[in-house]
Amino acid sequence: MIITIDGPAGAGKSTVAKQLATALGFDYLDTGAMYRAVAFCGIRKSVDWAKPDALVAIAEQMQIRVEAGRTFVDDEDVSDPVRSAAVTEKTHFAANNPAIREIMVRRQRQIAQQKNAKGNSIVTEGRDQGTAVFPDAECKIYLTATPEERARRRVNEFAQRGETVDYDETLAQINHRDASDMAREVGPLCEPPDATHVVTDGMTIGQVVAELVAIVET
């Protein structure tokens, strides 16, 4: 079984998907982290961001695997480093690159196929999982929250990692990101017509997970 969770940036997809997978005994596939990993490697290798092909070469060469909810690049656990503000700022160079998108989608499908072949169901999250990557998924969820709620969560998330970011600037970035994600030609943010729409404002993570478990089990 494949469960897709799509939604805008800062909606809590990663946290919810991880906990939903744990609650159901499924494997978790963090597709967003895969694009972040490409950007992370680009920063580490001082790539010229004005040359898209340079980043494509990195994406082609890097070995990505997902294990127990963690993301590894060339056997290095990068699950935490890829969440930094610096990586967040550069991730769009990977996510908006058609060639990199094609590489990552292919790898996501391969990972899902391998896990399903072993009898393991997965929870996968991103921007277009239920539309472009896994259009035939058995259960699709669109998870969202207001921009203000998402900005507050993002500021708190960075604070917990010892990083300080401005709320107003974060809110502006989220609004810009939403518009950009919906308008981009490659992998645009789009709610699957057959997805269950869930707004999480005012809800705890536990409440959201409980609601999604109920949706999956119905």
Name each model-derived stretch:
Residues 3-5:
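Hydrophobic anchor at the beta1->P-loop junction of P-loop NTPases
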Residues 9:
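The conserved Walker
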Residues 13:
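Conserved lysine of the Walker
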Residues 16:
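Hydrophobic positions on the alpha1 helix immediately C-terminal to the Walker A/P-loop
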Residues 22-85:
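N-terminal phosphate/diphosphate-binding loop that engages ATP/GTP or pyrophosphate donors
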Residues 73, 77-81, 89, 155-163, ...:
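NTP-dependent small-molecule kinase module
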Residues 79-82, 86-160:
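ATP-dependent NMP and nucleoside kinases share a basic, alpha-helical "lid"
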Residues 126-135, 141-152, 161-186, 206-207, ...:
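Anionic, Ser/Thr-rich low-complexity intrinsically disordered regions
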